[in-house]
Amino acid sequence: MMTQGRTACRWHIRAGENETKEIPAFFRRHSVTDGLARILMRRGLDTEDKLSHFLYDDLSDLSDPFLMKGMKEGVTRLLSAIDRKEKIVVYGDYDVDGITSTSILVRCLKGMGADVGYYIPRRETEGYGLNEKALLSLRKEGYTLLITVDCGISSAKLIARKPEGLDIIVTDHHTPPEQLPACIAVINPHQKDCPYPYKELAGCGVAFMVARALHLSRDGVDFTDNVELAALGTIADVVSLTGENRILVREGMKRFLTTSIKGLSSLLIASGIVHEDTKAITHADQVSFGLAPRLNAAGRIAHAKEGVQLMTTESSEEAERLASQLCDTNVTRQQIERNIFEEAQKRIAELAIEKDMALVVDGQDWHPGVIGIVASRILEIYHRPVLVLTVRDGVGKGSCRSIPAFNIYEALAAQKDLLLQYGGHKMAAGFSIEADKIPEFRKRLNAYAKARLTPEDCIPVLEVEECLPLSDVSIDFIHSLDLLEPCGCDNPKPIFATRQAFVETARRIGQDRRHFKCQLSAGKELIDAIFWGVGDIDPCRAGDVVDLVFEPEVHEWYGEHVQLICRDIREENEKLLSRDLLVDIYKKLTVFLKDQPRPVKEVQSCLMTQGGFEKVSLSMGLAVFEELELLSRFSRNGEEFYQRRIATKKLDLMESEVYRKHRMF
């Protein structure tokens, strides 16, 4: 019997019953298997032209960088500064996107003979983006041209007060506010009237386009050096891995093993991603889980300039030292993160906000470098918008993570009268606020969220490609999926479901026993299945028959074998409810109870015999109607009766706990 307490997820099977079984011949011409072809067609790649772009587009297929609004003006000013030997400073951000953006332009400008430096604010004391003190200091150091990367789009007021003699170019990819900075140039594909066709570039992608434009203008050559850094930053910033981002990431990762960027090479080795047997790096999650956290650790715990130093040094010895240092810093970050996560959970209980539609969690002197990660971990538990703030000297600095149904940037904008500063995207943002305004902010944000979110929005959805028998999950099948790489946002790794899998063995694994491993029958074979971070609850027991959702992988340990990374699991005999089933039950129920109340046993018996409903599903359906107050139960002479009730408001099935728990995916 399966244990209780696991998180409920909704499984959305993308393969519909009416899905065409015929695979167009052009897929075979490109050596695409039928299984992969079905996945690609579901993702809209249903013509040979679309497939060819997906499989073969390279750096030569990138758009003309001068299509980007502001590019011509920005490049003209940069080239003038280079020719006149002006001091140029690249002003970046402290995350991986900011570090790689800064490194791309520093390496490019140095290569063109520029007198260039860089500046990245300290996360802990300066916060995100431009600040007045930094601008004044940079001007005193003799800089006459400042170019931002991955920041600046929301700094119109500050730029209007810039020091005399300091020109500014803004390059960014964040959502532009109504008022744009008045400066030499604003380069951001999201700004109005920007004709650049691809809008989803990360900050490093925009910086890479600036580098291309500089060389096209000066040398007439399309410059593609440093695309490795664009790949790293694009993956780390979790932007869409489609179109030009897919090109940057795929082409950049191809160069990882032969890169001339000493810091990147050293970090690949120090992180364990590259060793003597490594033949290629094709999976984006190797970067997102292996490289990005280590580079991010610099900006979170130490100073992000260490990351830029690593990616711009020409010394192999310095590169090895800095890479090792970042790995040590990452270990420190992990411990700080664990401590704050535990404190945040206690704070949620203390505030009694577990049922809030948006969780606003504040703590005194929490390390600002890890609150974004903590917010992400809390979101995984509660599946609703999470805002984590650290309070120091009367000011709270917050990091936000959201769910697809809730635009957190718009939510912050709606409360901007309470905020000192804010910025970000639909799914992630940052802000600052006076500490005494946090309770009012929590109250207003929850009212805003409650008006826009339904209970259904707060239940995670697993987008499952299709249901497969385990016997179909072969090593060859898994290798065929590699053509999808790089996978990430908008091009996810495919996950699959299987039904009626028999659990042969089940046990805890790992030093802290937080993980779980079982073996599932697949015909004559046994397949290993792993559950990461299950906590105190065993997902299943030996002897269970289960349905599960999994990501397949080839595990290389004494040879290749199939392993499943499990995402969710259900007992095979769970009786699940669908909207159609409930509508059918309700129609027959209203006829049966039209004139008068009837005994519960009589209602159930008649609906089973006349309606053909299975007993357990029928019982669950009737329980849903009771929870929604469409049906009431009362006793008369020791017998239970049902009475129909008239709905007085628009009904939402997700308000029923029984439906949420047992609904059909």
What positions do the PLM features span?
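Acidic, two-metal ion nucleic-acid-processing modules in DNA metabolism proteins
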Residues: 2-3, 105, 110, 246-345, ...
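N-terminal amphipathic/basic leader segments beginning at the initiator methionine
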Residues: 1-19
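Hydrophobic helix-and-loop "lid/oligomerization" segment in the mid-to-C-terminal part
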Residues: 16-144, 164-165, 215-440, 467
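Generic detector of well-ordered alpha-helical packing
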Residues: 94-98, 151, 173-174, 189, ...
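Conserved acidic residues
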Residues: 144, 184, 547
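Short, small-residue-enriched loops and turns at beta-alpha junctions
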Residues: 96, 123-128, 175-177, 610-614
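Histidine/acidic-residue-rich, glycine-tolerant segments that coordinate divalent metal ions
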Residues: 149-201
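Short alpha-helices
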Residues: 104, 181-235
